[in-house]
Amino acid sequence: MLKEFKDFAVRGNVVDMAVGIIIGAAFTTIINTLVNEVVMPPIGVLLGGVDFSDFYLLLKEGSKAAPYESLAAAKSAGAVTLSYGIFVNACISFLIVTFVMFLSVKGINRLRAKEDAAPDPAVRECPFCCSPVSVKAKRCPMCTSELK
């Protein structure tokens, strides 16, 4: 049983998946930093100096009466909030990650297409009956039409 587990654990697919998960976690940190520190501040400036991470709806006041200066102040007062600004940041992060993954997969598929390009086919289609015919054939074996 231990040998079977060892064979499973060191099999190529499991190791590849583990490496992918670790790289994905690191990539997520990079994207979150990109969104929170690079993308959102200019958008906030364009919208009048707004910080999206501080957008929230107050559901219930805390020990200190509202209004609160920021989401952090509301949370420290024990207020119950709906923090939709953090959700907006998460949605933007998701869109960036999916777009980068789309571009990555598209590039990889383009490279694979060049590698997987098949040589000229050994078969062509008969123009009369549409059946497959050898490229070397002078007549179609199905309809006996002469081929050029």
Curated annotation (Swiss-Prot):
The UniProt record lists the keyword Repeat = no
Q: Does the keyword Transcription apply?
A: no
Q: Where are the transmembrane segments?
A: 14-34, 85-105
Database matches in InterPro entries: Mechanosensitive_channel_CS, MS_channel, MSC/AndL, MscL_channel
Q: Which SUPFAM superfamilies match?
A: Gated mechanosensitive channel (SSF81330)
Q: Which GO terms describe its molecular function?
A: mechanosensitive monoatomic ion channel activity
Q: How does this chain sit within the bilayer?
A: Multi-pass membrane protein
Domain of life, per the record? Bacteria
Mind telling me which PROSITE patterns this protein's record contains? Answer: MSCL
Task: Report the SS bond pairs.
Answer: none
Q: Which keywords fit this entry according to its UniProt record?
A: Cell inner membrane, Cell membrane, Ion channel, Ion transport, Membrane, Transmembrane, Transmembrane helix, Transport
Where found, per UniProt?
Cell inner membrane
Purpose of the protein: Channel that opens in response to stretch forces in the membrane lipid bilayer. May participate in the regulation of osmotic pressure changes within the cell.
Recorded hits in NCBIfam families, A to Z, give: mscL (TIGR00220)
Membership in a protein family = Belongs to the MscL family.
Question: Quaternary structure per UniProt?
Answer: Homopentamer.
Q: What is this protein called?
A: Large-conductance mechanosensitive channel
- Species of origin: Chlorobium phaeobacteroides (strain DSM 266 / SMG 266 / 2430)
